[in-house]
Every structure is written in C-alpha cells, then in structure tokens.
C-alpha cells in the first residue's frame, strides 16, 4: 500500500496526473487458482495422494475396530494388553502417515504455486502492456475499486492462453 501511495505521489509531483493514469486491480490469488493449470494440478495431486489417504482411512477403521473390541469386555487381560499395544502402534503409524502426507502435499503445492505465481506475474505484465495500464494493484491492497477496473478474469484467460494445459506446461 505504501508503495502504491509513493508511486501515485511521484506521478502527481511529476505532473503526470494531467496525462490520464490507467489503473487496474486484480485478485491475484483468485486469478491463479482459477487457471486451468492449477485446476489440473489440484486434480493430479488428489489422484497421486489418494492411495495414501485410503491407507489412512483403513488405519482409522482398524483403530475403531480395536476400540470396539476393547470396549466389548470379552477379552481376557492378556488379549486386552495385546490389543492395546496393537492400537498404540497403529495410532503412531497413523500419526506419522498423516504428518508425512501433509508435508508431501504442502511441498508439492508450494512448488506448483511458486512456478504458477511467477508465470501469473508475467501474464499480468503482458496483459497490462496490451491494455496500456500504468499500474496494476492487487485487491488485497485496495480498500475500494469499481468492478470495471478488475482484470482478474482477463488475467486468468491470459495465463491459460500463455500456458495451456497439456502442452508441457510443467
């Protein structure tokens, strides 16, 4: 916000305000998340990690079954002890698997978003040049704007055109 204010003040002090300044706003996050590449990457991530998620669902069911058996009161002391040990082992395994999965998903998601974010900046810069814009501000830093100044959909379309899915966009 301070950078925008400084830029506007610099333009004003240079007398450039009399020459119409063209400003647009963009919701960069929304534009990025709506690209075909990000949508495909999300589907690919879900498919890639589904077997691990399914395994964790199975472990959770196993833990529920163990708890049901323990609550039944039909086990002797040795059986109860063995089942409790098995339950603790499965609980630790589940926690490790959940943490590993979360870290793996987050790492891949971060890589995808960083690459796509850089591409989005390039697409927005090119779009701004095509539209003759002087300043493009993210809506995160904007208190108010008229919808006519929003180029979010245009940026998504420009990104999809520049980086079509399925043509080596990775």
What does each model-identified segment do?
Residues 15-19:
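Sec/Tat signal peptide C-region and signal peptidase I cleavage site
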Residues 2, 6-14:
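Bacterial N-terminal signal peptides
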Residues 20-142, 162-170:
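Amphipathic alpha-helical segments
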